[in-house]
Every structure is written in structure tokens, then in C-alpha cells.
């Protein structure tokens, strides 16, 4: 990420602020509705609208992204444990990270329309692609 990208990501995530868990849950719900095959990784979850389990996992997603934003210069170090978990224990198909990234971008665009400029969109897309790359790096 360029310095400008890092600035855009930090500024956008700063505006997310206290809504991070809410937006994380909304992005998950959006992903489940738009890409139903992603539900197969959550057979034990109540996937209905407003589910406590979806909200809880959305909070985990948001916390991981907050950690990533705080460690933009060392994403592999910051996300190593999550990479191990998703590659070795959960065995999530890597394409699902792209689907969640897309759902997150749509969610952020809907909540931050005035701030979601083309430059911010591009920077967030690069950031989420980097996060996805790190999370799938231990699959090899």
C-alpha cells in the first residue's frame, strides 16, 4: 500500500469507529444472502437477520480488521494466528475472503457515502486484498 492508500484506509476505518462490529455483522449477512454457498462454513450458526451468532462473528471480523489497520506495515505478523486458524483448522476456501471483502466494501459504501470516494474505494479494496492474501498465505 502506498502512503496515500494507508492514509485513506486509516481515515475510513476511523469513521467506522464504534460501528465496526455492526458493519462487520452487516457485511457477513450481506455475504450470506448474496453468496449462499458461504453459509456452508457456518452450519452451527443461526444465520437469520439479527442473529447473535452473526453479530458475534461480525465483531470478530471487525476486530481483526481494526488490528490490521493498526498494523498496516506488518499485516503478516498481525494476522498470523488468523491465517493459521483459517488455513489449518477451519479450511475456508480462499475465494470466500474475496466475497467477504466485496460485501464489506458495499457495506462501507452504504454507510459512508460522502467519504467513499473512488480513491478511498481503491485504497480499501487494496487493503482488503492484502488482508485476504495474508489470510490465505499459509494454505500453500
From Swiss-Prot:
Q: Does the keyword section mention Membrane? A: no
Modified residues annotated as N6-succinyllysine in this record:
6, 10, 15, 39
Domain Globin intervals: 1-140
Binding annotation for heme b: 86
What Pfam families would the database entry show?
A: Globin
A GO term (biological process) for this protein? hydrogen peroxide catabolic process
Q: What is this protein called?
A: Hemoglobin subunit alpha
Report the source organism.
Tragelaphus strepsiceros
Amino acid at each position: 500500500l502506498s502512503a496515500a492508500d494507508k492514509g485513506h484506509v486509516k481515515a475510513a476505518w476511523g469513521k467506522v469507529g464504534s460501528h465496526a462490529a455492526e458493519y462487520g455483522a452487516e457485511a457477513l449477512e450481506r455475504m450470506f444472502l448474496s453468496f449462499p454457498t458461504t453459509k456452508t462454513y457456518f452450519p452451527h450458526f443461526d444465520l437469520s437477520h439479527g442473529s447473535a451468532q452473526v453479530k458475534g462473528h461480525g465483531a470478530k471480523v471487525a476486530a481483526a480488521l481494526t488490528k490490521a489497520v493498526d498494523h498496516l506495515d506488518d499485516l503478516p505478523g498481525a494476522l498470523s494466528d488468523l491465517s493459521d486458524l483459517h488455513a489449518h483448522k477451519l479450511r475456508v476456501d480462499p475465494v470466500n475472503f474475496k466475497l467477504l471483502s466485496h460485501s464489506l466494501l458495499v457495506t462501507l459504501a452504504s454507510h459512508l457515502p460522502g467519504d467513499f470516494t473512488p480513491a478511498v474505494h481503491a485504497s480499501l479494496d487494496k487493503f482488503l486484498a492484502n488482508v485476504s492474501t495474508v489470510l490465505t498465505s499459509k494454505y500453500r
